[in-house]
Amino acid sequence: MARKPGQDFRSAQSGLSELKSRLFFVIGALLVFRAGSFVPIPGIDAAVLAELFEQQKGTIVEMFNMFSGGALERASILALGIMPYISASIVVQLLTVVHPALAELKKEGEAGRRKISQYTRYGTLVLATFQAIGIATGLPNMVNNLVVIDQTMFTLIATVSLVTGTMFLMWLGEQITERGIGNGISILIFAGIVAGLPKAIGQTIEQARQGELHVLLLLLIAVLAFAVIYFVVFMERGQRRIVVNYAKRQQGRKVFAAQSTHLPLKINMAGVIPAIFASSIILFPGTLAQWFGQNGESSTFGWLTDVSLALSPGQPLYVMLYAAAIIFFCFFYTALVFNPRETADNLKKSGAFVPGIRPGEQTAKYIDKVMTRLTLAGALYITFICLIPEFMMVAWNVRFYFGGTSLLIVVVVIMDFMAQVQTHLMSHQYESVLKKANLKGYGR
């Protein structure tokens, strides 16, 4: 059978067309996300709200506001952002380890994954509702004249608006994952972080222009930033490869020769979750002090002010607890997402083995030993990245828009996005090659 002229070209064009449509979908979804972050909750005085957020520097509120792309400081319907979904996902992952029914559900393949995703949505709804009620009832008590309508009506409207906004973002993230490129939730967080980058760069340049920030110091910070980004990319791509062999075996009339492959284990298996949770916990007392401890010693919660001062960025106690929290969550979350015993059992069932290690229990212990060392290295790496901005702020008295957590998220999401694009292009190249081979075989 003769091959039609231009068939390869049309196949390549089809692959590029699909990639373009996915990219345009991601861009469109991000535009909707950014537009939604400017839709305010009815009944709030914007000027009073702006003054309130000036007092929230260095608290958990500032971090969540950055993740939401500034939606929180504008009291947008998307102010809660996607954090309730992340929290619900981690809770459900923890339950799949400790709850037998969910553990079995996890093993049921695609059907089990869909069921777990549904439970995550329910958890997101519950967490978003509690957080929305907290914000709706807490905001009017933080400052006078913030709410310009009846407080009961505002509580109802704000709660419904915030919960709806979070559920919409969850749906939008799932649509990006399915119809776009990359992990939709990560891309939304990435978009929220980089949305404030132009403003931060403009403020930094203005400080340098007015002499508040020396030009040489600015150049040094830029060089260090590029060096840290390079280091993050290097560490995120790093992995330990455990050699795995498959013995010669026979299935029916087919004989499969002995094969050798490897089991890749990432240095940073936990990703950015430990940094996010550690920041949330360390900054939480300061946030409570801002909300409840503003009346000093006469307040019931006045002691929170002393705690928040001890845990303010740059303080020795803050640095030690922050580092300890990151290391703890690295080991904790890695234990949730990776099970050495399950991996060893899967290798044994498939007829694979690690050279020099007995299949089963001994293999599980060996993988656990390797993973523990990798997790320690990954935890120290994340701690180093997250503490660099803290040390620089103390040494040079310069405030950074990008903390270590934000930098990790941005770099990891970009790397994942580029890998997804490359995988998509490669899959279409393989598809084109296979079609060509099939047509040649058919034409003989």
Curated annotation (Swiss-Prot):
Keywords: Cell inner membrane, Cell membrane, Membrane, Protein transport, Translocation, Transmembrane, Transmembrane helix, Transport. It holds the Pfam family SecY. One of its GO terms (cellular component) is cell envelope Sec protein transport complex. The chain crosses the membrane at residues 24-44, 77-97, 123-143, 153-173, 181-201, 215-235, 269-289, 318-338, 376-396, 400-420. GO terms for biological process: protein transport by the Sec complex; SRP-dependent cotranslational protein targeting to membrane, translocation. InterPro entries: SecY, SecY/SEC61-alpha, SecY_CS, SecY_dom_sf. It comes from the Bacteria. SUPFAM superfamilies: Preprotein translocase SecY subunit. Its main location: membrane. One of its GO terms (molecular function) is protein transmembrane transporter activity. It is found in: Cell inner membrane. It is a multi-pass membrane protein. PROSITE patterns: SECY_1, SECY_2. The keyword Transport applies. Gene3D superfamilies: SecY subunit domain (1.10.3370.10). Belongs to the SecY/SEC61-alpha family. NCBIfam families: 3a0501s007 (TIGR00967). The central subunit of the protein translocation channel SecYEG. Consists of two halves formed by TMs 1-5 and 6-10. These two domains form a lateral gate at the front which open onto the bilayer between TMs 2 and 7, and are clamped together by SecE at the back. The channel is closed by both a pore ring composed of hydrophobic SecY resides and a short helix (helix 2A) on the extracellular side of the membrane which forms a plug. The plug probably moves laterally to allow the channel to open. The ring and the pore may move independently. Component of the Sec protein translocase complex. Heterotrimer consisting of SecY, SecE and SecG subunits. The heterotrimers can form oligomers, although 1 heterotrimer is thought to be able to translocate proteins. Interacts with the ribosome. Interacts with SecDF, and other proteins may be involved. Interacts with SecA. This is Protein translocase subunit SecY. It comes from Vibrio cholerae serotype O1 (strain ATCC 39315 / El Tor Inaba N16961).
